[in-house]
C-alpha cells in the first residue's frame, strides 16, 4: 500500500515538472551573448591552463 502511493507520488511529480527544451537551455550559463560567453570561457580555461606555469615560476623564484 505504501509502495503504491510512493510510486504514484514520484511519477506525478515527474509528470508535473517541465523545463524549457532546446539547444542551450540545459546549461547553467547563458549562451545568448557570444562575446560575454567568449570572455567567460577564455578566463575559465585560460586560468586553468596558466596555473601550473605560474606555480612553477613561483617555485623557481623562491630558491
Curated annotation (Swiss-Prot):
Gene Ontology cellular component annotations, sorted alphabetically: mitochondrial inner membrane; respiratory chain complex IV
Pathway(s) served: Energy metabolism; oxidative phosphorylation
Chain segment of the transit peptide: 1-16
UniProt keyword Protein biosynthesis, yes or no: no
Keyword hit for Acyltransferase: no
Modified residues (N6-succinyllysine): 25
GO annotation, biological process: mitochondrial electron transport, cytochrome c to oxygen
Pfam entry (one): COX7C
Gene3D superfamilies in UniProt: Cytochrome c oxidase subunit VIIc
Key words of the record: Acetylation, Membrane, Mitochondrion, Mitochondrion inner membrane, Transit peptide, Transmembrane, Transmembrane helix
Segments traversing the membrane: 34-60
Sequence ranges on the Mitochondrial matrix membrane side: 17-33
SUPFAM superfamilies: Mitochondrial cytochrome c oxidase subunit VIIc (aka VIIIa)
N6-acetyllysine modifications at: 25
Side Mitochondrial intermembrane, residues: 61-63
Lipid bilayer topology: Single-pass membrane protein
Location(s), subcellular: Mitochondrion inner membrane
General function of this protein: Component of the cytochrome c oxidase, the last enzyme in the mitochondrial electron transport chain which drives oxidative phosphorylation. The respiratory chain contains 3 multisubunit complexes succinate dehydrogenase (complex II, CII), ubiquinol-cytochrome c oxidoreductase (cytochrome b-c1 complex, complex III, CIII) and cytochrome c oxidase (complex IV, CIV), that cooperate to transfer electrons derived from NADH and succinate to molecular oxygen, creating an electrochemical gradient over the inner membrane that drives transmembrane transport and the ATP synthase.
Sequence similarity: Belongs to the cytochrome c oxidase VIIc family.
Subunit-level organization: Component of the cytochrome c oxidase (complex IV, CIV), a multisubunit enzyme composed of 14 subunits. The complex is composed of a catalytic core of 3 subunits MT-CO1, MT-CO2 and MT-CO3, encoded in the mitochondrial DNA, and 11 supernumerary subunits COX4I, COX5A, COX5B, COX6A, COX6B, COX6C, COX7A, COX7B, COX7C, COX8 and NDUFA4, which are encoded in the nuclear genome.
Name of the molecule in the record: Cytochrome c oxidase subunit 7C, mitochondrial
Species annotation: Papio hamadryas
Gene giving rise to this polypeptide: COX7C
